[in-house]
């Protein structure tokens, strides 16, 4: 089954081999969660396409065509299933793709689908020509970037129509359509029903006043409680609230209309549905695609736990008490926030770092109105840091030493001048080199920042205090040797070792 998975991800055509088609049909029959989001099934007798976990009536084998992406299925003329809802499927990690460029572009298109960006601007952001990007993208996904972007917009709209009571006009704008008429035409052309028809079919949504709720699927096993524990130990006063069942934070993002949207987002687990429940304040609707992308990154919903577990077997066999099934790497919601906090946390305890960061955000963070006690600030922007007359004095009087204040200032300058990129689509290895050129940032900080902000799967923190505590008999060089066979998933090895300390 695992070889089938590998062939499926890397193969040119899932339908070229009768053997592979039969194997994928068996996956579809079994509802194997490992393949959710990695293959979609078009059914010729109904004209719809499904996730592999769909519970609708099983179609005949001869009526099935297999696709690697929802966009590829839609380009072939299939409509999304109303039962399994392909828009909720987990995505793929960067390591899953032959073309790192194509995967980075896909992430950017999905996160920014509500904006008016062009394919040429995406290519330029990634450092390539539009022609090169289109060629790489089509070779990887079987569709053009424009087709993929259209599917992202339509599936986001379908999710908002199904899960919220937002007016159709707001759904259209929040999904990247320039007008309601254009939205209605596209929806009807591709899904053969109008947005209003979809609303009638779904019944009444459960909606809390002033909020919207969306759902994000993941592949089990998924250790949500350990992610929450990680975030709870590092919760930033005024910005984050974490309890036993949920994570809540302030949000400040640019919306599709170019205006800044401020509000809050809450994330909870629905283990029975293998999905996260994401509730956000109504003010964030203009930035909903970006909020969803950031929650996916923060909670590592695109990870494939089977592939990761196989890679970490040497660690589990060598270290008693290490659990590898379902381990996730905690990402972040605000990349600059985490980069700054990584510097603040150098050579001090987590608790001390939290207090320092809390003082900084209380003094210099922008006030955010959320209506939730304890959530009233956003972390500093790059421009906020650069506007400080003397960062050493500003942060120094709050307890941060000069070298770390200077490092934060240098990071802000590098980002502002385009020498450092922590945004979605960045190449982690290149940005780690850029980070290491900043005085005051060493290998630990560079790897930690890449792991948390860029979903870099292969960072290892051999000098980290927690890793050393989990492997007390080994030197840093021996710790590196221990996890060499875990490549390219050593970030997950770090989390497995940290988690073992609380077990």
Regions found by a protein language model. Name each.
Residues 2-503:
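HhH-family (HhH-GPD) DNA N-glycosylase catalytic core used in base-excision repair
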